[in-house]
Amino acid sequence: MTELCDIAFKYKTDKCPQIKHHFTEYYHEIFKDKRESVRKVVEIGIGNMTPGIVGASLYMWREYFPKAEIYGFDINKDILFSSYRIQTFFCDQTSRKDLYDLIYHSIRDGVDIDLLVDDGLHTPESQIYTCKMIMPFMKKYSIYAIEDAGYANTDLLIDEYDVEVFTPGKRRKFKDDRLIIVRQRG
């Protein structure tokens, strides 16, 4: 287990293998040497469908990235909150206006996002639409992560961006146990 797995388990987010997915292992590999330099993390989908802390992964990111501002977006207005270095906002990720507001208004100058995690509606259509709307505004070395992704997403994104698919192999227990990492080319 990685340090991020332990932090995720502490907050009861399903991103860690102790609860459900192995995403935190992969995130740790990407960011373990960059933790101090990450300044802005955005997550779409902050609700918790299992018992635990609403916004659990936002608290996880805040602890893992000690200098980052954390922004969460959700379609459920009843779960929005703010806390030290965490702000949350309403966003319907199927709405062009809401995604535009996410980039330009809510997080003030979206181009400096280091990590954006789509853990929102979990439909291929919303995942592809959101990625195609936001990726052009992200800086060159940003990471755009699509959690709980279907295989169809890769084919639709691969022509425009560098795409890497993470599946935990033999450990995979859930059909949604798939993470797609999208990066700008070049």
Can you annotate each of these PLM segments?
Residues 1-117, 121-146, 150-186:
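A short alpha-helical cap/connector motif
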